[in-house]
Amino acid sequence: VCINRDFGDWQPRRGALEQVMARIRPATFVLEPGVYKDKLPPCHVVEMRSDMDRTAYEKMKKDYLVELGGAEITALTAAAVTSKLQQMAGGWVYDTVSEASDKAGVFKSYKYAHWFSTHRFDMLDEILEGNQQDNTILVYNFVEELAQLKTRYPHLWTLDDGADVVKRWNDGQIKLLAVHPKSAGHGLNLQYGGNKMVFLSLPWSLELYEQTVGRIHRGGQERDVWVYVMLTNKTIDERIWSALADKRAISEIALEELKG
C-alpha cells in the first residue's frame, strides 16, 4: 500500500508478510552470521547528533526554493526536494546551472555546491580525534561530500586509487578510506584493516546500509565494530534513519517467520 506517493513510502498490507513467508519457507534455508562459522564480535551503532541553523533548510522544505550565495536554488519535484533536504542536513546543497552549448537548442548542465554550515565535518574531526587516529572507513553518498573529504584529509584514500587499495587497507597502511555504499557491497573484505566506520550521510536502502557495515563486521574481524551515524537534529536525517530501522524490523520479523 502506498502511504506517500511523493516520497515513495510503501508498507505491506495487513497479513501480506505472513503470506509471503509461508510461500517461500519450504524453499528457504536461513543462515545467520556467526552461527555456522566463527562468532562475530559485537557491532555498536552510535548516533552522532548535531544542530545547525535551519533557516535555509526550512525555506527549501516549505517553498521548494532557497537563495544562497546570490543564487536561487529550486527543487522542481517532491523527490528533488527530498534529495536537497538531505544535502542541506549536511550543511550544503547542489545548484544546477544550464548554459547554452555550441549546438543550437542544446544546453549543458553543471552542478555547483553551496556551503552554509560545517557542523557535520566539524563533528567528523571530533570523531576522528576521539578514535585516536584508528583506521576508519568514511561512507559518503554525494560527490560533493567526497570532494570535501579529500580537501580536509589529504591522506584520504578511495577504492579508485589503485588495484591494491583493499590490500593496503587490510595491511593497516591506510588511515582513512572513503567508500560509497554502492561500491562497498557483496564480496568486499575490509575487516582486517580496521573496525570503525562513519556514515557521513545515509542511503535510503537498508540493503546498502547493511552491506556496507558488513564489509568490516564479518568473519575474520577480531575486534568490536563501531559504526557512527551522523544525524542533524530536526531534519530529514531522522526520517531516513527511522525508515532504515523500520525496514530492519520488518526483515527481522521475516527471518523469524522463515525459522518457524
Language-model regions: role of each:
Residues 135-142:
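Conserved RecA-like ASCE P-loop NTPase motor core of nucleic-acid helicases/translocases
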Residues 135, 155-156:
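Residues that mark the start of a beta-strand
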Residues 1-119, 125-134, 227, 244-246:
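Inter-lobe coupling linker of SF2 helicases/translocases
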Residues 146, 156-247:
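Conserved RecA-like P-loop NTPase helicase motor core
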Residues 255-260:
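Long, largely alpha-helical accessory region at the distal end of helicase-like NTP-driven motors
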Residues 2-3, 29, 53-54, 88-94, ...:
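Short, solvent-exposed loop/turn segments at secondary-structure junctions
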Residues 148-151:
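Short amphipathic alpha-helical segment within the helicase RecA-like ATPase core
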